[in-house]
UniProtKB/Swiss-Prot annotation:
Highest rank taxon of the organism: Bacteria
Function: Component of the cytochrome b6-f complex, which mediates electron transfer between photosystem II (PSII) and photosystem I (PSI), cyclic electron flow around PSI, and state transitions. PetG is required for either the stability or assembly of the cytochrome b6-f complex.
Family from the record: Belongs to the PetG family.
Transmembrane segments: 5-25
The protein's name in its UniProt record: Cytochrome b6-f complex subunit 5
Complex formation: The 4 large subunits of the cytochrome b6-f complex are cytochrome b6, subunit IV (17 kDa polypeptide, PetD), cytochrome f and the Rieske protein, while the 4 small subunits are PetG, PetL, PetM and PetN. The complex functions as a dimer.
Length: 38
């Protein structure tokens, strides 16, 4: 059985991780277009 604390931490980190990856990819995409790179 999973401890509530561990479950809470995992459920809290997943959205943050996904958001971080999305922001990083978006910034890289914008920066690439700014310099004319694909």
């Amino acid at each position: 059985m999973i401890e509530p604390l561990v479950l809470g931490i995992v459920l809290g980190l997943i959205p943050i991780t996904l958001a971080g990856l999305f922001v990083a990819a978006y910034l890289q995409y914008k920066r690439g277009n700014q310099f004319g790179l694909d």
